[in-house]
Amino acid sequence: MSQSGENVSPHERTFPVERVQIGARMEKNMVKVLKALAEYFDISLGDLLEGIVLHAFAQKHPFGEETLKRIAQLKEVYGMGYDASASHRFIEQATTEERG
């Protein structure tokens, strides 16, 4: 029986979707942390972001204590020295290539 059937537990059910490529720009060190976290879970970056968004939309925390500790380590390794209070306050800077 297909996992999208009704006799499957909610955690085993699958959802057919159509994915699209997006051209989003994000802060460089945040992307490094997200990529490392996706690699840690052995999932794609897109899958990780989808999970974070779905949890946020449902007003749930996407990560447990163990993962939050891992994120703190990754933030330190990749120089992500800010938290949620920086939301919507980033100022775009010219890249090294753009400065000449």
Report the location of each language-model feature.
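Short amphipathic alpha-helix starts
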Residues: 18-34
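Intrinsically disordered, low-complexity regions of eukaryotic proteins
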Residues: 14, 29, 52, 99-100
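Amphipathic alpha-helical interface surfaces
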Residues: 30-33, 45, 70
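Short, positively charged interaction helices/loops
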Residues: 58-100
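Short, basic amphipathic alpha-helical segments that act as recognition/interaction helices
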Residues: 41-68
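The alpha-helix within a helix-turn-helix
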Residues: 38
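Arg/Lys-rich, low-complexity, intrinsically disordered N-terminal tails that contact nucleic acids
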Residues: 1-17
